[in-house]
């Protein structure tokens, strides 16, 4: 059987419907439904979003503490606070199985090399939370034996203020870490060398609530605080 290929002429008259004309109709409602139900972007963006969702909802903490802030951190793992809502109830005894570590307490100079080695044993991706005034800036221990902030030797992702912070503050810091992880862009495969990690710019909670603090007119007495 022989075939003959012919080019379609869009301006040619329609033999089946002589009166009909070809027109491109733009339906805003149809286009809106298409954009809502059909993904028109890059597949990489979908994969990054799905992987970041899994990472931020299955954060396994490394179990160790330095001082009294560790007591408040462990309180957050009890039933009244239910940290399992955030997927962080699986406490690991080995840094090789943990996703993030919480520096809870006073970091002495003798402990700094140990903490740094534990951090290096963690697998990528990994994150660090600095919990309490002593871990953030040395606290009231402005002496030679205390490191004035764990960010002197570790990359800190979230700072939790307080002396010591309440368990609710730890949960808020965990939520901020989840928000930051959701906006990260990491390579989707094993990469040797520089991993090209792009971290999200997290706004300062202090600056965000500055107008709210200034607007307060009725201050509580020291006996009620």
Swiss-Prot record:
[4Fe-4S] cluster binds at residues 68-69, 134, 163. It holds the Pfam family Oxidored_q6. InterPro entries: NADH_UbQ_OxRdtase-like_20kDa, NADH_UQ_OxRdtase_20Kd_su. One of its GO terms (molecular function) is NADH dehydrogenase (ubiquinone) activity. It is found in: Cell inner membrane. Signal peptide: none annotated. Residues 202-225 are annotated as: Disordered. Gene3D superfamilies: 3.40.50.12280. One of its GO terms (biological process) is electron transport coupled proton transport. Binds 1 [4Fe-4S] cluster. The keyword 4Fe-4S applies. It comes from the Bacteria. GO terms for cellular component: plasma membrane; respiratory chain complex I. This is NADH-quinone oxidoreductase subunit B.
């Amino acid at each position: 059987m022989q075939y003959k290929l012919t080019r379609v002429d869009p301006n040619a008259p329609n033999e089946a419907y002589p009166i009909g004309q070809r027109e491109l109709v733009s339906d805003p409602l149809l286009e809106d439904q298409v954009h809502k139900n059909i993904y028109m972007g890059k597949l990489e963006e979908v994969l990054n979003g799905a992987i970041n969702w899994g990472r931020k909802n299955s954060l396994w903490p490394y179990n160790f503490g330095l001082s009294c802030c560790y007591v408040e951190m462990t309180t957050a793992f009890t039933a009244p606070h239910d940290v399992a809502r955030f997927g962080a109830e699986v406490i690991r005894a080995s840094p090789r199985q943990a996703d993030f570590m919480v520096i809870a307490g006073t970091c002495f100079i003798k402990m700094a090399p140990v903490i740094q080695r534990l951090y290096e044993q963690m697998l990528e991706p990994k994150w660090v939370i600095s919990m309490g005034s002593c871990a953030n800036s040395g606290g009231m221990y402005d002496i030679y034996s205390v490191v004035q902030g764990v960010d002197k030797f570790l990359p800190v992702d979230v700072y939790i203020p307080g002396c010591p912070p309440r368990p609710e503050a730890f949960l808020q810091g965990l939520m901020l870490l989840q928000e930051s992880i959701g906006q990260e862009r990491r390579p989707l495969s094993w990469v040797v060398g520089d991993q090209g990690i792009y971290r999200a710019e997290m706004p300062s909670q202090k600056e965000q609530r500055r107008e709210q603090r200034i607007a307060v007119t009725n201050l509580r007495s020291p006996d009620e605080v």
